[in-house]
């Protein structure tokens, strides 16, 4: 059935993304913008919708929206205005939401998925969040107004996405733009990036769209992909069985990996949009836009190009670009070490791997541990005072004990032996005892060299500097020719 559905139907997908902007204050008030503080502590009369209060747009949020519009190659609206979206709900104290219905700050943009494919962005607009509601067991609804007025930007695509894979890639590319440009931390698990997906299925080649189903508030990119796959197959199966596909709002159950009915969409809701009379239209100049972009915009393509130029594999480029926190730590170390692949090896593989072994994540690592990792890498790569095997053990112990590198080296006797006067007699001892092996050097150079270096490393409990041992070995070879 699944193969038949895929061969006969195509999926049409549109995505709406709500992003919490990185801002110290709310969209229209001076209240602190944070939803992690004790409930109902970051509030003001404006956030509570008291009569007579006057909203004042957050300039920093407007600047972030301009940067996003630039990153999405959009037309930037120079007359900044706001509108009222009128509806009643418990979490909306004013009875309306301030948004940008008539003149969105950006329109007609795109995100490239690769060189040839892109997703059309219809519009981006600024708006305020609603209060957070919690339902008690007895049906009582509690409201936390800390979230009321938190600045949001909504990104709306055109219905041009064709598959779950494209949808997932679009969200990854968007998240890169948001994090690298300090627009948002875009943490889906914390609600900073919320995704609604509109899905319809139609026979291949049909000019008419199928019935649209909206899936609300999906909490991870992986779940977005799974929700699209399930709902697409469900709709195709309904069409094949000649069952009606209902226009509905659904949620995704990440335990059963299915979509669940919430409510029917019977009619288009009329929100009676009107211009917000308490906020004057503000005209922004070309010079202002240029300055904002110059001071805030980060070109992600140039970062990726630099990594490629430094022979970083596409796999690790994706790893760094998809995790801004990891990239920041990578950049911090690489600014000193100046060797991308060595930093990736020790940070992304050894350091993160050691964290995972004790059930920790990168966010749990301290600045002290990161600085100690940098110090260890300097000892290894610049001073050659420790070797790679010792480095791996040091990273492991750093995570387990949180001790400084010098203490770990001292306690574990990891100080490398680099003195030729100490190492030469050890190597000569093994050369003298294994003359037949040395005689095989011309025919099997790598094997012979590895054998003698290995003997010295074993004799010194891994403390001999292998580069110094190699130098001594080459000197002995010349004397024996």
Curated annotation (Swiss-Prot):
An individual GO BP term: glutaminyl-tRNAGln biosynthesis via transamidation
Entry-linked Pfam families: GatB_N, GatB_Yqey
Catalysed reactions, as listed in the record: L-glutamyl-tRNA(Gln) + L-glutamine + ATP + H2O = L-glutaminyl-tRNA(Gln) + L-glutamate + ADP + phosphate + H(+); L-aspartyl-tRNA(Asn) + L-glutamine + ATP + H2O = L-asparaginyl-tRNA(Asn) + L-glutamate + ADP + phosphate + 2 H(+)
Key words, A-Z: ATP-binding, Ligase, Nucleotide-binding, Protein biosynthesis
Enzyme Commission code: 6.3.5.-
Disulfide cysteine pairs (residue numbers): none
Keyword Magnesium appears in the UniProt entry: no
Alphabetized Gene3D superfamilies for the sequence: 1.10.10.410
Iron-sulfur as UniProt keyword: no
UniProt enzyme class: ligase
SMART domains, sorted: GatB_Yqey
Domain of life of the organism encoding this protein: Bacteria
Region (Disordered): 29-50
Single annotated GO MF: asparaginyl-tRNA synthase (glutamine-hydrolyzing) activity
Subunit structure: Heterotrimer of A, B and C subunits.
Entry similarity comment: Belongs to the GatB/GatE family. GatB subfamily.
Function: Allows the formation of correctly charged Asn-tRNA(Asn) or Gln-tRNA(Gln) through the transamidation of misacylated Asp-tRNA(Asn) or Glu-tRNA(Gln) in organisms which lack either or both of asparaginyl-tRNA or glutaminyl-tRNA synthetases. The reaction takes place in the presence of glutamine and ATP through an activated phospho-Asp-tRNA(Asn) or phospho-Glu-tRNA(Gln).
Protein name: Aspartyl/glutamyl-tRNA(Asn/Gln) amidotransferase subunit B
Taxonomic source organism: Malacoplasma penetrans (strain HF-2) (Mycoplasma penetrans)
């Amino acid at each position: 059935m699944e193969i038949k559905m895929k061969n006969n139907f195509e999926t049409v997908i549109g995505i709406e993304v709500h992003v919490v902007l990185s801002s110290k204050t709310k969209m229209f008030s001076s209240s602190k913008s944070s939803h992690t503080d004790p409930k109902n502590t970051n509030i003001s009369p404006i956030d509570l919708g008291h009569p007579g209060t006057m909203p004042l747009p957050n300039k920093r949020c407007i600047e972030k929206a301009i940067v996003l519009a630039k990153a999405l190659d959009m037309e930037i609206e120079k007359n900044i205005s706001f509108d009222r979206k009128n509806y009643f709900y418990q979490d909306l104290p004013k009875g309306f939401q301030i948004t940008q219905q008539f003149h969105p700050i950006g329109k007609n943009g795109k995100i490239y998925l690769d060189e040839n494919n892109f997703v059309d962005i219809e519009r981006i607009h600024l708006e305020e969040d609603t209060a957070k509601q919690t339902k008690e067991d007895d049906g009582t609804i509690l409201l936390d107004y800390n979230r009321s007025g938190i600045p949001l930007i909504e990104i709306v695509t055109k219905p041009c996405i064709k598959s779950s894979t494209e949808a997932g890639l679009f969200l990854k590319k968007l998240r890169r733009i948001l994090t690298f440009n300090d627009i948002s931390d875009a943490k889906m698990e914390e609600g900073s990036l919320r995704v609604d997906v509109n899905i319809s299925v139609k026979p291949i080649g049909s000019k008419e769209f199928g019935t649209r189903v909206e899936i609300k508030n999906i909490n991870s990119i992986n779940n977005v992909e799974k929700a699209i796959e399930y709902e697409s197959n469900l709709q195709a199966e309904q069409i094949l069985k000649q069952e009606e596909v209902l226009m509905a709002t659904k949620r995704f159950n990440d335990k059963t990996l299915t979509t669940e009915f919430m409510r029917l969409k019977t009619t288009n809701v009329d929100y009676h949009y009107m211009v917000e009379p308490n906020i004057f239209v503000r005209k922004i100049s070309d010079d202002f836009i240029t300055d904002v972009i110059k001071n805030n915009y980060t070109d992600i393509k140039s970062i990726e190009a630099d990594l490629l130029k430094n022979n970083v594999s596409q796999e690790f480029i994706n790893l760094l670009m998809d995790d801004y926190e990891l990239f920041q730590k990578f950049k911090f170390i690489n600014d000193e070490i100046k060797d991308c692949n060595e930093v990736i090896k020790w940070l992304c593989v050894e350091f993160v791997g050691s964290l995972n072994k004790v059930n920790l994540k990168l966010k749990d690592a301290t600045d002290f541990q990161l600085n100690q990792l940098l110090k260890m890498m300097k000892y290894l790569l610049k001073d050659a005072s420790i070797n790679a095997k010792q480095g791996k053990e040091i990273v492991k112990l750093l995570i387990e004990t949180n001790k400084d590198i010098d203490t770990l080296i001292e306690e574990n006797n990891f100080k490398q032996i680099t003195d030729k006067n100490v190492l030469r007699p050890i190597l000569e001892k093994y050369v003298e005892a294994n003359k037949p092996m040395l005689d095989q050097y011309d025919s099997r150079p790598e094997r012979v060299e590895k054998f003698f270096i290995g003997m010295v490393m074993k004799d010194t409990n891994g403390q001999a500097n292998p580069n110094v041992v190699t130098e001594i070995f080459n000197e002995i070879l010349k004397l024996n020719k």
